[in-house]
């Protein structure tokens, strides 16, 4: 384990079992933030969320990530939790974490379908309606980060976009990590001219909580016109959800009132809310309007 903040909870809840728990904390080469060879940044998987949130270069050039890291849990947990662990954490679904023998634990059904589902997904659910709990993953996906993985078969690099697995492909895994593999570091590309990024999180409690609705934006401006865009949602789907419909709605246009209104409608395109979470549609529309308006200003 890295920081262990999620693993220990999973062991306590019976979601995972282990004959032994191995700490990675002694691997100093997996810790720290440094420049890479192309003008970007290399962030070790064991770097704490607090370190990510307050790093001057991240705050200046990768604002969405700094903000997302600062929004995770509480100060105590950010001091212990790591960036790699935040990417690889297990779902927070109360059926999965509870005593229910659901699909993800080898059962026959997702209990969120007919049960309490206020915090479950509105996009990408296919028989399993978890939401991915990470705040940093959407920000990293928006910023086109890559995950470096090492294991028994060697090293490989995976775009954050392709690191997570939808339930329709595999009920039992949240990421593409194989047996014996671990995340060594995350790499951010050099920021391009005109890049502005942000992360906004809506939660039930002001103190700390997981996202009901979250939005990571990375827009490249040429004057007032949006030249390129990556829009990624948290709290919406079993994986960090890239809203390509929203990107199409704003690229090539200035962020005027009409473009923002179109983007707000596009962000929930294809949404299929359950009985108790239709409110998320209004939340995502509101967050999109708020964040695009702020960037336009």
Language-model features: where?
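C-terminal structural segment of proteins
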Residues: 1-297
